[in-house]
C-alpha cells in the first residue's frame, strides 16, 4: 500500500490531525498545515473498486465526516475515527484533483479559501472549485505525485 501526503493544491498545505498526534483521539478534526512529519502520512485501503478508506498511518484511524452520516450536510467537519463502515468511504480522484465522499460531496478547507491559514479545519461540501482540489504526493518529495490506488 502506497504511503502519501494529502496536499491542498492551491496553498501547498497538508492534511493533518489537529495537534499532530501520532495517536489522535476519535473525532480529532483534520486541518490544513504547512508542516511535514510522519504523523501526517496516509494510505488508501481500497474496499470496492474506486471506494476505500483513507487511513492515518500512525494511528490506523480513518477519515470520516463527523457523526459518520451517509449524506452529511455541507460544512460537516472531517475527523479521524477508528470505525470502518460504508459512510467512511471516499474516492481519490487523480484527474480532477479532489476527494469525494461516497455521499457525493467533497473535502474542502472550511470557508473555501485558496490560501487558508495553518490549522484551518476541513469540511465536506458539495461545491466544486479550484480551492477544493487536493493532490497526493510522496512523503520523500512533496512535489512528486503518487498513485494511491497502487
Swiss-Prot record:
Consequence recorded when altering residue 37 to A: 1.4-fold decreased porcine stomach mucin-binding activity compared to wild-type
Record text on activity regulation: Bacterial binding activity is inhibited by D-galactose. Hemagglutinating activity is independent of divalent cations Ca2(+) or Mg2(+). It is strongly inhibited by N-acetyl-D-galactosamine (GalNAc), D-galactose and D-talose, and to a lesser extent by melibiose and raffinose. Also inhibited by glycoprotein asialo-bovine submaxillary mucin (BSM). Not inhibited by D-glucose, D-fucose, D-galactitol, N-acetyl-D-glucosamine or lactose. Fungal binding activity is inhibited by D-galactose.
Record field: transmembrane: none
Stated consequence of mutating residue 129 to A: 2.3-fold decreased porcine stomach mucin-binding activity compared to wild-type
Residues binding D-galactose 2: 27, 64, 67, 83-85
Swiss-Prot/TrEMBL induction comment: Up-regulated in mantle by challenge of yeast P.pastoris reaching the maximum level at 12 hours post challenge and recovering to the original level at 24 hours post challenge.
Effect of residue 19 to A: Loss of hemagglutinating and porcine stomach mucin-binding activities
Oligomer and partners: Monomer in solution. Homodimer in solution. Exists as a monomer in solution when a low concentration (0.001 mg/ml) of it is present. Homodimers start to appear at a concentration of 0.01 mg/ml and tetramers at a concentration of 0.1 mg/ml.
Additional remark text: Cleavage of the collagen like domain may decrease the agglutinating ability and alter carbohydrate-binding properties. The function of this protein could potentially be regulated by proteolysis in vivo.
Protein name (Swiss-Prot/TrEMBL): Galactose-binding lectin
